[in-house]
UniProtKB/Swiss-Prot annotation:
This is Flagellar assembly factor FliW. The gene is fliW. The keyword Chaperone applies. It is found in: Cytoplasm. It comes from Campylobacter concisus (strain 13826). GO terms for biological process: bacterial-type flagellum assembly; regulation of translation.
Length: 127
């Protein structure tokens, strides 16, 4: 699935087109079509309760309507073992499946203090 980047991933502002590749039911790969950059992402709902309001700026930018089919992912920094990998819950990637656009939405940490920028996956695994 090829997406047009409407609001760039921080530090990767030059990337305008990305491909979303499903790896399994939890993980996806987001690969740039402009260079060799790629990100491993996770479905946050597989780990925790995760809710936030999409600011109106992003809704307009991505033409998000109430009926829009959205997918939310979070970038992870992969480590071994996998449980030591960290998840960025502060800046989710929002994908609008209706028009194939995506944006990185940076959440206001004062509004969402429960979400961290580098939370270990092991903190969400039942032991």
């Amino acid at each position: 699935m090829i997406f047009s980047v409407k609001s760039p991933i921080l530090g990767f502002e030059h990337i305008k087109t990305m491909e979303l590749i499903e790896l399994d039911k939890f993980f996806v790969k987001l690969a740039s079509k402009d260079d060799e950059t790629s990100f491993t992402m996770i479905n946050p709902f597989a780990l925790r309760s995760y809710e936030f309001d999409i600011p109106s700026y992003y809704e307009e930018l991505m033409d998000i309507k109430e009926s829009s089919q959205l997918r939310i992912y979070n970038i992870i920094v992969v480590a071994l073992p996998l449980e030591k990998s960290t998840v960025n819950f502060v800046a989710p990637i929002v994908c609008n499946m209706d028009n194939m656009t995506l944006s990185q939405v940076v959440l206001d940490v004062t509004k969402y203090p429960q979400y961290g920028q580098a939370e270990m996956i092991e903190n969400f695994i039942q032991k």
